[in-house]
């Protein structure tokens, strides 16, 4: 059976909500709202995709600690097969504690970069997938996968100092690239989405530019297509929206849908994500997604 897959670090978020203020040094403040959830990144994308009924695999790093055990449980509940490639003896997952006040969010994070995972391990774990979410590293892995016939999709997220030259090797491998507005402007050197799409068309056949609340612009066979965002969603927390969009987009690819339908699915899953605090808290099942896609089919505007 066809499956989707991706390699990336697992993130676990501890969310302290409804805080009136941050504590001063030496103080302790209590809140009555706390949640523990999976954070963003490729494993989070696979969880949202698994909840849509797609068979998927996340290649990641887990250790023998309570946070890794929590993540493992979340993967299994979503129907995601975890493949552990961690070889160390520390806590392998990234952990973020977020203090959420009325005006802002403040973070304290832990991350362990120590690991000896090899490109061959990652390739062997991803081999055979119909579609793979690309990591910012290991271009040789994705080149081999593409040569195998796997569709490879790049969504890097914002990285300080990112340039088109730095991402050239990955873009030349990717079948699809999913930058948001900020990433698009930095990489293309223009604030005009149409011109940016033409810049990206030198690397990918069908450029896609995410325009945040304005939807997504597709440049397909010389035609611009706008897929509008979903107006009914009320934003509570935008964290994880890009990862959720990626899941909806992958759902469409896994079902051989036209690219504009893939983007519509992405707008729906990404829009749903922002209606609750946390990267993987708010989501649709497959039936709900298809109902929403039918309801908003006219959000696809051709010859834009």
Give names to the regions the model predicted.
Residues 1-61, 66-70, 77, 304:
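Glycine-rich phosphate/adenosyl-contacting loop at the front of the ribokinase-like
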Residues 5, 193-304:
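Conserved phosphate-binding/catalytic region of the ribokinase-like
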Residues 11, 63-64, 111-114, 156-161, ...:
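Short, acidic/turn-prone active-site loops that include or flank metal/cofactor-
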Residues 148-151, 158-227:
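Conserved phosphate/ATP/ADP-binding segment of small-molecule kinases
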């Amino acid at each position: 059976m066809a499956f989707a897959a991706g390699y990336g670090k697992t993130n676990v978020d501890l969310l302290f909500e409804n805080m009136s203020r941050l504590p001063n040094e030496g103080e302790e403040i209590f809140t009555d709202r706390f949640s523990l959830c999976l954070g963003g990144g490729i494993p989070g994308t696979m969880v949202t995709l698994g909840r849509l009924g797609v068979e998927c695999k996340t290649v990641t790093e887990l250790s023998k600690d309570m946070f890794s055990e929590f993540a493992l449980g979340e993967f299994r509940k979503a129907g995601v097969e975890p493949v552990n490639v961690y070889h160390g003896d520390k806590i392998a997952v990234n952990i973020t504690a977020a203090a959420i006040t009325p005006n802002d969010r403040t973070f304290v994070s832990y991350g362990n970069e120590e690991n000896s995972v090899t490109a061959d391990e990652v390739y062997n774990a991803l081999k055979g997938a119909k579609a793979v979410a690309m990591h910012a590293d290991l271009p040789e892995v994705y080149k081999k996968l593409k040569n195998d016939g796997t569709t490879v999709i790049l969504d890097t997220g914002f990285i300080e100092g990112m340039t088109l030259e730095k991402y050239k090797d990955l873009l030349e491998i990717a079948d699809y690239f999913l930058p948001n507005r900020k990433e698009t402007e930095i990489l293309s050197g223009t604030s005009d989405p149409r011109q940016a799409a033409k810049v990206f068309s030198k690397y990918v056949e069908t450029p896609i530019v995410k325009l945040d609340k304005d939807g997504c612009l597709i440049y397909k066979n010389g035609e611009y297509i706008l897929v509008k965002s979903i107006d009914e969603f009320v934003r509570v927390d935008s964290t994880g929206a890009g990862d959720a969009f990626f899941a909806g987009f992958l759902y469409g690819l896994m079902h051989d849908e036209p690219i504009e339908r893939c983007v519509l699915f992405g707008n729906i899953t990404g829009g749903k994500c922002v209606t609750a605090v946390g990267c993987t808290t708010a989501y649709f099942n497959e039936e709900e997604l298809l109902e929403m896609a039918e309801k908003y089919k006219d959000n696809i505007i051709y010859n834009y």
